[in-house]
Each structure stands twice: as structure tokens, then as C-alpha cells.
Amino acid sequence: VLSSATKTFNIAGTKNSYAVIENPKLRLAFQKRLLANNQHEISGLGYLATEAAYRYGKDWLEELKQVFEDHINYVVDLFGKETKIKVMKPQGTYLIWLDFSAYDLTDETLQELLRNEAKVILNRGLDFGEEGSLHARINIAMPKSLLQEVCQRIVATFAKC
């Protein structure tokens, strides 16, 4: 098992990943690879941050999950009522895929509308492969007021299409 508290608790940069490897041969091979790549050091800050997150972060995490669920429902409801954008409800993440294929657009035009008209920058679907054509990914890990502003800009832009 390879894991870290990085994304869940927003402590990236603290060198806090860890491995649980029961098989002694695999563990030794893994340790050798870490040493060869100069990735074997433990960060005191990362260790403490991970321990604090796992030990004391449960209530905070439950509250965060509720905030994200509220944000997801907001995006689904707004775009479902106000646009032809299909929202793919995420599972276990704060990244939502938006499907713009109901509009008669090219990928280039979609990006131009988002950037120049709506004044938002989303992850281009094509960056994830051809099946991402006419899709974009929005990160909802932001204050609700900012999410509302971003989504309202998108709604206003695509109301004209």
C-alpha cells in the first residue's frame, strides 16, 4: 500500500508519503529503489503533519466532505436547470467533469469561450485523451461564493450559445 495524507488534508510538500509492504523481499527492493533515487529520507514535518491529520482531523474531514457534497449538488442543479452542460457527479473527489457536447462547438471554441467570455480556466478534457473532447474539468475546492461566481459566468456564457 502506497499512501499519503497529502490531498485529503492539503499538506502537499511535507514529504509525507509512506509505504506498507508486508512481503520482506518486495519491501527490501522498494527500499533499495528509494535509496538509489535519493528518496529515502523522512521529513519530520511530514511525519508530524500526517500524524496530526490522521489523529485529529476526522471532524474537519467530515465537515469538508459535507462542503464538497454541497458544492457538487450546487453545480449539478445549476447546470442541469440553466444549461445543456452535462455534469458527471464525481466519486470521492472535488473534481467535476463537464460535458459540453450538446453545444455545436469545436474544442478550440470551447476553450476560447471559457477563457475569453466566461473568464475561467478549467482543465481541458483533451489533456486527458481524445475521449475528453468537448469536456472540461472544474475544481470545486474553493469558497462557495467563488464557485457560484465561476458557475454563473459559465451559465451566462453558454446561455448565448
Where are the predicted features?
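PLP-dependent class I/II
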Residues: 1-161
